[in-house]
A protein has these predicted regions:
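Short, acidic/polar
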Residues: 285-292
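Conserved SAM/AdoMet-binding glycine-rich loop
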Residues: 45-49, 54-55, 160-284
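Proteins enriched for Cys/Gly/acidic motifs involved in redox and nucleic-acid/cofactor modification
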Residues: 1-176, 191, 216, 231, ...
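Short beta-alpha connecting loops at secondary-structure transitions
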Residues: 243-244, 315-321
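Contiguous mid-protein beta-loop-alpha structural module that forms a pocket-lining wall or clamp
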Residues: 282, 297-299
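Hydrophobic, well-ordered secondary-structure elements that form the walls
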Residues: 233, 274, 294, 302, ...
Length: 360
């Protein structure tokens, strides 16, 4: 976005890229808008991102906001030309189209990450699944994949530019390829990258859904030392009934089995996971199953979300857990996560690892 805005001649403007994962994220976005306007009243404010895509009117109604643009529009230089100095206020204040009609996701690939030695390549966007708690598909649209050839060419350019590590990212990364000819799998993409970009030192995968992991990805985990031994899993909960109410595609035993199999193939594999505390109807017994899952999967890095009702989602209509109890349960999970991190760090004492300086 920054490069597009600069190319279009946009100046003296604050662009706020919003998040919609939780109600708290939306609140903080609006708080930041008001803060920036107080501190820099002479600057125009343009709002974009998932929260703006999902509920543009709530931002357009703010006196501090000059323009609201959607997730597709923010990737178009023509949008930014229309918002360049002198034109804000003359174009439509809200420019947000139907994200569900978008079928392409390749044109926004980024070539520059400043002084960092790690680069990110978004190979997939959107999600075809409808978990009952999640609003993100309405901000990102349906699942769409970047063709493998485009991904490989992008990574070659990044490696030629000096990047030592590439991270593959996506909203629902393990669904990569489902919309492409011959429906390749994520493992096919990983193997192709490692084969065709031999000078790439490290390849890392961001958050995945373990139930969708394919055989080639498991083979890469077992045989490719350049594939980093760290996987972040979208687990969300440790109780089967809650997982069903979330409309997740896996059960508790599926998660445990995947972690056991992956660690057999790669003994140094480390897992992180997203876990939601206080999902509607969650009892103490349900919650305890999430706590136990941390040990049973031997998770090291926990990303704990206190449940946040998102308007329009099925979960928002389910019987809610008391807010204080949600916070208490989230705190217990975070404490559990802190303990797992400390255990992992103690286990590294005396060991030697090759490391990457992320920002030399």
């Amino acid at each position: 976005m920054k490069e597009l805005a600069q190319t279009a001649g946009v100046e003296n403007v604050y662009v706020i890229n919003t998040c919609a994962v939780t109600a708290e994220a939306v609140r903080k976005s609006k708080q930041e808008i008001r803060k920036q306007k107080r501190q820099f009243p002479e600057k125009q404010i343009i709002v974009t991102g998932c929260a703006a895509q999902i509920d543009p009117d709530s931002f357009a109604e703010m006196a501090e906001v000059n323009a609201v643009i959607g997730n597709t529009e923010k990737l178009s230089v023509d949008t930014w030309r229309g918002l360049s100095n002198g034109f804000i206020g003359q174009t439509e204040r809200v420019q947000v189209d139907d994200i569900m009609s978008v079928t392409e996701t390749a044109e926004h690939l980024i070539d520059g990450f400043g002084t960092r030695s790690r680069a990110y390549v978004q190979v997939q966007n959107g999600c075809d699944h409808r978990c009952t708690f999640c609003i993100i598909p309405f901000g990102r649209g349906n699942s769409r994949s970047v063709p493998a050839g485009v991904v490989v060419d992008q990574i070659k350019r990044l490696v030629d530019s000096g990047y030592n590590e590439v991270v593959l990212t996506g909203v629902d990364l393990t669904s990569w390829g489902a919309d492409l000819p011959a429906t390749p799998k994520l493992g096919d993409l990983v193997m192709r990258i490692l084969k065709l970009v031999p000078d790439l030192n490290r390849l890392r995968i961001s958050s995945i859904d373990s139930i969708e992991v394919d055989e080639n990805l498991m083979q890469a985990i077992a045989t490719e030392p350049r594939l980093m031994p760290h996987l972040h899993l979208s687990l969300q909960h440790g109780d089967d009934l809650i997982l069903k109410r979330m409309k997740r595609r896996h059960l508790r035993d599926d998660a445990i089995q995947f972690c056991e199999e992956a660690r057999k193939l790669r003994p140094d594999m480390i897992f992180g996971a997203d876990i939601i505390a206080g999902f509607p109807t969650e009892t103490e017994a349900h919650f305890e199953n999430s706590v136990k899952l941390v040990d049973e999967c031997d998770l090291t890095w926990l990303h704990v979300f206190p449940y946040s009702a998102r308007q329009g989602t099925p979960a928002a209509r389910m019987p809610a857990v008391d807010g204080r109890l949600i916070k208490e349960r989230a705190a217990i999970l975070r404490q559990k996560g802190d303990e797992k991190v400390q255990t992992h760090l103690r286990d590294q004492v005396g060991k030697v690892h090759a490391v990457l300086m992320e920002n030399p």
